[in-house]
Amino acid sequence: AVIPLQEGQPVHIGSWIFNAERRIVQQGAFSDLLRLSKEDPYCCLMDSEKVLPPITIRCAKKGERFAPIGMNGKSQKLSDFWINRKLPRQLRSLYPVIADRERILWIPGFQSADPCKITPETVEVLYIQAVLAE
């Protein structure tokens, strides 16, 4: 299933809860935002100007690729990403991904995509939080 993720409207999927909101970046706040994005793997900050709506929550598609931060824009098969992160095979087909109309933006608990990463020039961020209920 493909479920839209809209600002200010929490989405419940299985044991996950997703929230999204846009925030204007205050002058000099880049280093704080960068630290926040690195500290919590269940929150993602993206440059909202680089995101191509609509934003959706869905399961990965077979053969899909992902360009995580730290790979200089290069992509890898999502199956290889899962193997490298040691995600059990039985969870892979059910694991939620956040995507725009062209690509995976973020895998909750892991990295966001390099093409939408925040930079010192970012004016507005898209903040997405994922909570995994016990």
Model feature map: region roles:
Residues 1-134:
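AMP-forming adenylation/ATP pyrophosphatase catalytic core
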